[in-house]
Amino acid sequence: MALNREGVITKKHGLGNLIHRTTLNAKMRIDTIHGFRKLLEDGGYRVSCKRTSPRWVTSIDVKGIDCSNCFEERFLLVENRYFADGHPAIYGHNYLCGSFVRESEAQDILSYQGSFYDLLGQFLTEEVANSINTFRPAIATAPLAEILDVAVGDPLIQWQESFIGIFDHIVCRSLISFNPAYVDLTLLRKWT
């Protein structure tokens, strides 16, 4: 079942199991890889990460994050940077909705070594059930250009992700920017 779901095989009545080797060779598949460290490793890179000290902010001041239905008074901002062979590859702004953050543990986020998805489970009071993802083209602003080591005005891909808790609350909003020199976002679409 799993191999069929991942597109590695197709089961056809009368033909049996058909193997798709091209699927096995596809790198950086966002439909099967969860976590940016693993995504970059799958691309063949040596990966390092840097997480900024979390800080409380009263608004989301990043263009590109949908703030409709956002009634939080404050957010815990956590920024993640991922490096591919020492080069800046991915930069994430993550706004954890304040009313769902375990405040007594918030400063422990900096030393937390797990993935961002595991971090949400560790530091939020509501378990994440799913996320809604939107991909959009973007242009590198001066701050993003400096962070990702690209030229101002260069095209980027941005991934906006809203994390939804088990009680249908938005518990975190993120905007991730990708350096196209190091990241290919590959997605398998099954047709059979």
Please tell me what each predicted stretch does.
Residues M1-I19:
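N-terminal helix-turn-helix
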Residues T23-T192:
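All-alpha effector-binding/dimerization core of bacterial HTH-type transcriptional repressors
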